[in-house]
């Protein structure tokens, strides 16, 4: 037969061997499960006959009870002894041998640094550092003195964290080892400016400014223009002297500013050039603007919402007249203190970040407090005269209403009298109109 036929129809050969002379026989062996050493009945009988004392207290489920709430001071004081067991126990030199791996004699040590084939040197150094740190993570650091007696209270943790900032000698730069810390600032949010939205303006390519322009741009105004045909942003700047004065005035608080000093002072911002703008959306709180206050030793940060890229603008000849209409060559800017309404609107936005320092003020109460007593008396007298005038006007209105009602009644009576005479006249009118209608129908035919 061929190999193909073997897969289709395998041939079965008959086995004609004789039966063995002494075939095996199965023996019947009676077995009782009670006599086995593993039987539950035997264990119960031994447990009942002999007095067995439990070495470990067991509950109904034959389990050892472990209740952490019974440890005194575990949750209230957070005692490090009960939390971390034997981590902080100091061992003798003779007992440290017991902590090593029992298979240390059999293990073959391989120097990982020599394995350089198909691997870069930076990967080898990372694996060595990671291998060394795994053993250090398991062991807790032993502090000088009796560290076990200290409790992990909230106030204790805060004091230890704040104390680390006072020691400037121990701080090191993560990359530059030669750099040392000289001074520290407390990093806090600038809640006074959280009511405004801040952007990053980046001049791209040929739109970058010269050194002279950068010095004169201590204060500047960027005016965006958005139309259906095109959109751009215009940059305005002032003189170097005015920009320095304006910068100092803007940094002052509301209490320090005087309206008398700003009267008549106009800051002229002239248009320098226009730019094409492109807004780049970024995740919030990815970039911050930090303002340092050396007097108080505080660094205030402001979140920057998004980023705007400014590029050199090239205008088509078709749009040039439209651009000239919407461009402004000069902006005249003056400063003043905000009103109560404006301050309340800003404070409501600031309350989301600092509800304690920025609370809304009632506008009516402020107006009453600002007015002197003489003005209040005059206002009360005016209100009384206005009240008497209003009463006189109300009386006149009532008299006019009564006269109108009387006139309407007389007109209704006259209409009723006319209605009685109208039926006869109406019939006459209808009879006179019928022949005219008949004439019109004949003419149409």
Curated annotation (Swiss-Prot):
Q: Supply any other comment.
A: Present with 1040 molecules/cell in log phase SD medium.
Ranges where the record places region Disordered: 358-445
Q: Does the keyword Nucleus apply?
A: yes
User: Which positions make up the signal peptide?
Assistant: none
The UniProt function text for this chain reads:
The PAF1 complex is a multifunctional complex. Involved in transcription initiation via genetic interactions with TATA-binding proteins. Involved in elongation. It regulates 3'-end formation of snR47 by modulating the recruitment or stable association of NRD1 and NAB3 with RNA polymerase II. Also has a role in transcription-coupled histone modification. Required for activation of the RAD6/UBC2-BRE1 ubiquitin ligase complex, which ubiquitinates histone H2B to form H2BK123ub1.
Q: What is its main location?
A: nucleus
What is the designated name of this protein? RNA polymerase II-associated protein 1
Task: Give all Phosphoserine modified positions.
Answer: 147
What organism does the UniProt record list as the source? Answer: Saccharomyces cerevisiae (strain ATCC 204508 / S288c)
Q: Which UniProt keywords apply?
A: Activator, Nucleus, Phosphoprotein, Repressor, Transcription, Transcription regulation
Subunit (UniProt): Component of the PAF1 complex which consists of at least CDC73, CTR9, LEO1, PAF1 and RTF1. Interacts with FACT subunits POB3 and SPT16.
Compositional bias of kind Basic and acidic residues: 373-387, 414-445
Q: Which GO terms describe its biological process?
A: DNA-templated transcription termination; G1/S transition of mitotic cell cycle; global genome nucleotide-excision repair; mRNA 3'-end processing; negative regulation of DNA recombination; negative regulation of mitophagy; negative regulation of transcription by RNA polymerase II; positive regulation of transcription elongation by RNA polymerase I
Localized where?
Nucleus, Nucleoplasm
Keyword Transcription regulation carried by entry: yes
**One family name in Pfam for this protein:** Paf1
Q: Which PANTHER family match?
A: RNA POLYMERASE II-ASSOCIATED FACTOR 1 HOMOLOG (PTHR23188:SF12)
Instruction: State the gene name recorded for this protein.
Output: PAF1
Family affiliation: Belongs to the PAF1 family.
Question: Which segments show compositional bias classed as Acidic residues?
Answer: 361-372, 388-397
Where does the record place the modification Phosphothreonine?
422
* GO molecular function per UniProt: chromatin binding; RNA polymerase II C-terminal domain phosphoserine binding; RNA polymerase II complex binding
Which superkingdom? Eukaryota
Provide one Gene Ontology cellular component: euchromatin
Tell me the InterPro entries matching this sequence: RNA_pol_II-assoc_Paf1 (IPR007133)
